[in-house]
Amino acid sequence: MSNINKDALYDKVYGCWIGKSIGGTLGTPFEGRRELLDVTDFQTQSGRPLPNDDLDLQLIWLKALEDYGPLGVNEHVLGEYWINYIPPHWNEYGIGKSNMKTGLLPPLSGDFENGWKHSNGAWIRSEIWACCTPGCPEAATKYAWYDACVDHGTGEGTYAELFTASLESAAFVESDRDKLIQIGLSYIPGECRVAKSVQIALDGYKNGLDWKETRRRVLEDSADLGWFQAPANVAFVIIGWLYGEGDFKKSLLTAVSCGDDTDCTGATLGSILGIIYGAKALPADWKKHVGDEIITIAIDRGSWWNIPASCTDLTNRVMNMTPQVLASHNSGIGIGSGDTEPVNADNLAASHKYLNWLAEMNNSIQYDFIHSAVNIFYPEGVNISAGQEMPISITVYNKLPDPRHLEITYMLPDGFELIEGRKHLNLLHDTGVTSGKYEFTVRVRAGASVQAHNRGVMQMVAQGRPTVILAPILFLG
């Protein structure tokens, strides 16, 4: 088992939150300004931070971990916590919540008619997953998927959070900037727009361009996406990191001077460098400027009273949770008094198993029924008209070591007709020779009229098993 020194970890976790507070407070006054800026210092009075939803949402995710435990948190839990604890309806936040309220579960909640799914709302809240999985980026990235898909579906906003979460988790055990960026890139598709924008930033720096020209090239490539979008703003973080040349202040000032979603770029780069350097190494005057307090803006305080009041409080709560998360994921990482042991950067990159998992996530809805798991995917969407025939792709996974037969019943919406669909399947176990996975297609036809919400259920009964699979099906008229 690899060891991370407990005191060093505490300093890095605290550095993450203080760094985020510094960067968010530095960048917030310039948020939304798209022109090239010349930021030289804070615009606020010293002693308190500005509130920032980038941090607020992570306090809710910590509550979910504390309430449900490391293995109980998934996109369904986080979706329900969105509705209960996060009031704002800004951009993708509002669309994701509205879609869930109409019955669309994640990741459909983040995909359906969401013009903001490529935006910045997810990657700005990835640090909680990294801090709870230090040196274990694969686990961090799976949590990031559960998080991001709620309001970004399979958009670039989700890929952006996979990138930052993996990079930040790895930063607890690897401090080399270039290696960390490559680790982050390994967790997202090479052809996605986030990866392309990051590569433009890397190429500009490598080829000796100044940061302003590199920024211009990033903006030119992302012009079709518009403002407040993840690819360009993640690249601004990378520009600040590259051209800051190891200097905390210069790095954040450069990132914020790129403009656009400046509180997000400053806060995320501040947290990354806070993890790498630790809180003790951050500039004393900037730490003093923001203090230790957490001021919230996006949490329903009437529903939750035990909110961390300071970065110290937050760090202590994270430190209590982290050993549980690492153990739950069989990470092979322990936290103790000995020195932090070096880790080969190659071992931090995405595995083939992770990449296969990411491909299977796609935009299918996941259901876990203990002995089996079911994924439901609507290849032609969820909108349906009277008389229209629509396919549903079903994948069933065996989660236990025995094979089993499943009897399938379809309880369709009124007037709907089953055109195609298995009534029985033999779900084998995964032995290396046989696969514990079964895929099939269901086709339904709507009746002469449809309702606004057309709800059905696919029931699967496993012989000799008490748990009945009840997977909801929904079409919108």
Q: Where are the predicted features?
A:
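An N-terminal structural lobe/cap that precedes and organizes the functional/catalytic core
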Residues: 2-63, 77-78
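Accessory "access/gating" subregions that flank catalytic or transport cores
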Residues: 9, 100, 108-117, 128-136, ...
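A structural-propensity feature for long, helix-poor, extended segments
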Residues: 45-61, 67, 294-326
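Short acidic, flexible loop segments centered on an aromatic residue
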Residues: 402-415
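Short, surface-exposed loop/turn segments at beta-strand-coil junctions that are enriched for proline
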Residues: 428-430, 443-451
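Terminal connector regions
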Residues: 447-477
